[in-house]
Each structure stands twice: as C-alpha cells, then as structure tokens.
Design a protein with these regions (language model features):
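N-terminal alpha-helical modules
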Residues: 9-157
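Sec-dependent signal peptide recognition
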Residues: 1-3
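N-terminal signal peptide c-region/cleavage motif recognized by signal peptidases
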Residues: 5-7
C-alpha cells in the first residue's frame, strides 16, 4: 500500500493494488478480459473522499501506473532471461533463427516512444486544463498495463 499524506490539502490517500489483483485472478491473462482490470485499483483509490480531487486523481492513477511499470519490468526480465537461454541453445544446436532476446529488446524500445507519444497526445487534448495531469497518468497506466499483460501472456510459451 502506498500512502500520500497532506498533499495540497488532499489528506490521506492510500493506493492498494488489491482490486486490480482480484480482477486479474478472476480473468484469463491470455484473453482481453484482463485488460478490463487495468485501473481497478486507481478507481477504488479515487472513490475515496480525497481521491476525487485533481491531486488525488493524479496520485491514484500514478500509483497504479507505477505498480504496472514494476510488473512490466519484472515480466520483461523473466522473458529476457528465458529468451537469452533459448537463443544460446539454438546457437549450440547450430540452428540459425532470429534472436528472441534481440527481438524482445527492439520491440520494447519501440514501444516506449509509442507509449510516450500516445500519452503526450492525450495530454494535449486537455490544453492547459488541470485534468491533463491525471489524464496523462491514466494513459501511462493503461498503456503500461496493456504492455505488461501482453508480455505476461508470453510466459510459458
């Protein structure tokens, strides 16, 4: 659980990933239904009295984005380790195949600027409005959650 105390009069906000985890536990990670779980915990956080302010919304959305980012980094590491081992085995066997590790790295490096551009566009749609900060955090949360789930669906394949 992550806490925010007294930020700009927001009082105490707490982010707990429980709602998202519960949703994921009931979904099949290989199906699009898992995508519906993205934002569940941020929504629960924003449903609290202090979560409905602009500062509160930004905090809640950012907290879930950071949670998904940690999850994405963990699954990326798992996949990279497995892919490096598979690439080494293919080389040992003399099989010329595209590198899984290099392909994963290239894909992830291309995805990051896509995510950033998509969320820059989301921010731009708000002009100078105060909702732009939470909108950007929400976009980053959704894009990162989708990428984490996409990579998680590759585990065990």
């Amino acid at each position: 659980m992550v806490m925010l105390a007294g930020a700009a009069g927001a009082g105490d906000l707490a982010f707990d990933p429980g709602a998202t985890l519960s949703c994921l536990a009931q979904s099949d990670l290989n199906r699009s239904g898992a995508f519906d779980c993205i934002g569940r915990s941020a929504s629960a956080c924003m449903a609290t009295p202090d979560g409905g302010t602009t500062v509160g919304m930004g905090y809640c959305l950012n907290a879930e984005w950071q949670w998904w980012d940690a999850r994405l980094n963990a699954v990326y590491s798992q996949l990279m380790n497995g892919h490096r081992a598979a690439d080494a085995e293919m080389a040992r066997l003399g099989i010329a195949a595209p590198s899984l590790a290099d392909s994963l790295q290239a894909m992830q490096r291309a995805w990051i600027p896509f995510r950033d551009a998509a969320c820059d566009y989301e921010r731009a749609t708000w002009g100078n409005g105060t909702g732009g900060g939470p909108a950007t955090a929400g976009c980053l949360m959704v894009q990162t959650g989708r990428q984490a789930l996409a990579l998680e669906s590759r585990l065990g394949q």
